[in-house]
């Protein structure tokens, strides 16, 4: 019989000015802290806001692949109580059977910088920062962290 183990993260909120919660995420000051789940992705795909926010994209491409992030409008709409400066991390895990590379591309309204490719058997971390939440002008920046 298997036993489930629950892990809880303790947060010291004494020096925080604003904490917001809903069923899917916690926002502390402007940083989104969400439940982490894995999303299986194979070849070239457009990633949804929900998949991105929950944190881990497990890639098993059978050729070179591009994972396009959601548009800024969809991403802003997908973050509860979003504000300029809201941010979160996500990871791309390239579990390809051969030497196929995954490239992360910003969606419409997004800007990307840093290393955006993930080689076979590599896990790369990315940081997303919301830079505009105004309707029809939504924007974000995504950094590929080396």
Per-segment meaning from a language model:
Residues 1-3:
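Sec-dependent, cleavable N-terminal signal peptides
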Residues 108-111:
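Short, solvent-exposed loop/linker segments at beta-strand-coil boundaries, enriched for Pro/Gly
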């Amino acid at each position: 019989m298997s036993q489930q183990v629950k892990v809880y993260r303790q947060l010291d909120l004494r020096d925080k000015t604003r904490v917001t919660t809903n069923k899917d995420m916690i926002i502390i000051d402007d940083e989104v802290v969400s439940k982490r789940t894995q999303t299986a992705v194979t070849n070239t795909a457009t990633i949804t806001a929900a998949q991105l926010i929950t944190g881990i994209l497990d890639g098993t491409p059978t050729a070179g692949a591009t994972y396009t992030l959601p548009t800024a409008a969809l991403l802003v709409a997908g973050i509860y109580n979003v504000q300029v400066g809201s941010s979160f991390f996500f990871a791309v895990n390239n579990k390809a059977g051969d030497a196929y590379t995954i490239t992360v591309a910003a969606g419409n309204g997004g800007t990307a910088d840093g290393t955006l490719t993930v080689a076979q058997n590599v896990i790369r971390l990315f940081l997303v920062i919301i830079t505009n939440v105004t309707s029809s002008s939504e924007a974000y920046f995504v950094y590929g962290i080396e």
